[in-house]
Curated annotation (Swiss-Prot):
Membrane topology label: Multi-pass membrane protein
Other remarks in the entry: Acquisition of Mn(2+) in addition to Fe(2+) is required for intercellular survival, replication in macrophages in vitro and for full virulence in vivo.
Name of this chain's protein: Fe(2+) transporter FeoB
Organism: Salmonella typhimurium (strain LT2 / SGSC1412 / ATCC 700720)
Gene Ontology MF: a single term: GTP binding
Gene from which the chain derives: feoB
Amino acid sequence: MKKLTIGLIGNPNSGKTTLFNQLTGARQRVGNWAGVTVERKEGQFATTDHQVTLVDLPGTYSLTTISSQTSLDEQIACHYILSGDADLLINVVDASNLERNLYLTLQLLELGIPCIVALNMLDIAEKQQVRIDVDALSTRLGCPVVPLVSTRGRGIEALKLAIDRHNANDNVELVHYAQPLLREADFLADAMAQEMPLQQRRWLGLQMLEGDIYSRAYAGEAAQNLDTSLARLKDEMDDPALHIADARYQCIAAICDVVSNTLTAEPSRFTRAVDKIILNRFLGLPIFLFVMYLMFLLAINIGGALQPLFDAGSVAIFIHGIQWIGYTLHFPDWLTIFLAQGLGGGINTVLPLVPQIGMMYLFLSFLEDSGYMARAAFVMDRLMQALGLPGKSFVPLIVGFGCNVPSVMGARTLDAPRERLMTIMMAPFMSCGARLAIFAVFAAAFFGQNGALAVFSLYVLGIVMAVLTGLMLKHTIMRGEASPFVMELPVYHVPHIKSLIIQTWQRLKGFVLRAGKVIIIVSIFLSAFNSFSLSGKIVDNINDSALASVSRVITPVFKPIGVHEDNWQATVGLFTGAMAKEVVVGTLNTLYTAENIQDEAFNPADFHLGDELLGAVDDTWQSLKDTFSLSVLANPIEASKGDGEMATGAMGVMDQKFGSAAAAYSYLIFVLLYVPCISVMGAIARESSRGWMGFSILWGLNIAYSLATLFYQVTSFSQHPTYSLICILAVIVFNVVVLSLLRRARSRVDIELLATRKNVSSCCSGTAGNCH
């Protein structure tokens, strides 16, 4: 079979991702475009004659980049197409918004690359009484047009057949440009490298006349002639860019008049009715908060019910199983304990996180595909405008509820560097899925019936601190106003189940692989340092270990936030949590249960793997039946109490070490707000610079330490009033000094993003091998 590389391109909300998932299924690979942290997805599928590599390009309305502030999505899509890596393009067009979508289609066809138009969302168009003559549209465009309903899989086989049959577009004159424009486009084309096809050279000439800054990188010496061409055109027309766009829109209007009845179409009544409530200025925000709480309830409640299968199952296989092998093969006791506690304990920490994190990713995917996520940005626009940000900057922040890394990367959709940078600085404060795992364990141990309220308050606190960080930046080092907010609100529709599952699986797989590697390595590392003293001798009590000795020296620093000297395990959790937040649970689990594993004798004769696995299945089934009872729905934290090791020995030790719910909540505040994990730090550095990464770390540490100290000292003021008063005053004075220094430093701060300084044309024009 012949190999074929196809680029999948289309407007945002045109159903491009759903079509990508329909074609490729689980055969996907996610990486980054070379040089920038913009996600690049590739998938594989086969037609009758070809083995196809499908590249999912970022959604864009146009290939024209007017300024360097244009979002990176448009730049990358444009440069991939110009690179010539794609043998064929599939342009996904929303049939219910044909006129707007055809602008990108005309640009692609003018470029001369073989193209197939995938006319998607025909079901929505039919509901709006939109009728499109597919054959007439294909004739007018000069390329195949395949009708699709990607959410239901309709038209997929016809699309594959079109891929096998299509070689080149018909030579159809689409747009009638004014003669002066064609003259100058030919003048510029003659100065370009002659090995480039004439059609592509002429297209680049028109793009340059329209003001596209990145087409100059491909124009060679012709870029030097641009000023001459513009000077000649100035005598004949007012604005060449306006004339080019007007010619294209006239062509689009003529096509739509012939092939469709879009002028008499009826907008979706359901969408209009729901939006009257969802977008209401008074109801919009409460509804958004309710949706966020629903996401939290789903993750805790249903995810927690599935935990026994992953928790008890992993204990049976990776802890008791390793102990059984060790005793059966007569391993030394220290080696058996080391493997069970380090390797087995690490795996046992990762797997119980899967159901809760998976349910959260599923809910986020549902919100994105249903059309609500765009509404959330619209609802939050007024608040974001107060920060000097457009409403769409809240979309990356919402994604942060799943993971902060795509939240930071999502800032690329914003146009202005200042807006991108402010959003990047706010993103780490959004409570990610890994933090949810920590909150659920502490809530079950300390807060009882108030657990749901405690966890939800931490989510709200993260949003509040992100907003306050934005206000601080606006009034100190990043003064400015938000750019005008124009955002398309897609029609509501039921998400496609296959697409939801694939998106959830891709995110969950990335989380488990990333978290698993770190947690297992950290667990083994901690087990080693927990087994030996500073002198290198094996210890019987972990309080005599090297890890305990070093941690006791550092722990007094955290006394103001309620971490006492004998609770050195909590200090270790904060340091390992900087690598990945989910490691905090693994660290506390490893350290708090270490003595139990050492003291409890294991009898290999009593171990039966099948019985333990059946017990895990029975516990899970019982949890699922109990999940939907009224008592559990009223208090979803109950679903997370069956958390294996953490639910028994570790929770008892943890309760004793912290001493109070106030100290535990203060610790959670610090975990929520302090340094981002290593992956987020790397994303911040690549999307901005190392300097801004350092600022994010220091600001997060300050906010976390200050707020946790204030909370704990206020709640425990009666126990030590003098000490509490000193701590509170010290925090206030320090932050006043910090804010004063930031106000003075604003004139010396460079807010230009590292990503915008990179030569995107060079880094995005490579082959698929550059996806890493």
